Amino acid sequence: MIFEAHDYIPISSEAQRNIANLEQAYSAWLDTARSMHELPASMYWAQKNGADYLVAKLSAKDNGTAQGPRNAQTEQQHAQYLDEKQRLQARIAQQENILTERVALYKTRLFRLPQMIDLIGTILRQLDIEELLGIDVMVVGTNAFSAYELACGVRFPTGNEATEDFDLTWCRKTKAALTFNAGLTTRQQRKSLFAVLREIDPSYKINRSKPYQAINDKQYEVELLAAPSVHPLPKAEAFAPMYSLFEQESLLLGRPVSCVLATVSGKACPLVVPDPRFMALHKLWLSRKPERKSSKKDKDQRQGYVLLDAVRHFLSSSHPLNMDFVLDLPEDLRLIFDVWCKERHFVPVS
């Protein structure tokens, strides 16, 4: 199964400009959304023992914390809070209007660009606001392939079939996470993945028979995978991924890819996914895994070949298949890569 450059459908230059404009608009919106998130949910005066006290609620569910009795300092604190909140609300409203316009252009039927289902988009936006996306977790599985298409500037002939499965892999304090650390506040007390899911939908619960999986009342599943090297996870994390997923290790290597695409209903959706070279070889490895369900093996193989060939044709500058890459490969993946090279008469350059 060999894919040549002409087997892929080019994304037009106009569509690529719209993709870049959407990413720019989303980045501006995200900065404001994070600033809004840092503010208390509300700040108000409450009476206690006949005196006014300033109370701040960090979230809607918070009982509130007294900031002190009414005086010049707390009145100034309250006024500054109201001014900042009003300023950010005005800015984010303007940015959301721009985002709506950019998403509409992205979704132009002529371009036929990949789209994400709405629930996944909601989860990923919130993970991005909370500074978990790309820092603690990356998207893996079929949902990652939309990012690879945008990175390559083409639509794949196969491999990006619609799916409602949602898999994440843990990447905190790994080489992959370093790519996205720059410029973040990296709050000392960030929420856990499970806490973010519960904030979106309180019906999410950890599946007792599969503790690496959270499931809501509508039976939508979110799974967290983790390589042995990242265990144990933080105590605050309710997920309990299996310790034996050695194949996840390779997804923490190389240079991850990030992008922004549209959801079906017209929202922006960020994606951070593993290095496409390692994801492709990971998929080919899965297609050879004896315990793997036979129904999944064919899809794994198609995805692995179409992605690695796409890297060969379109990502030689950013993700070269050179000797440096070969030397970074674990032995089991190097054997698969050697076979792939022989089939294509491909010789990695120094």
Task: Please state what every model-predicted region is.
Residues 1-53, 61, 66-350:
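Compositionally biased terminal segments of proteins
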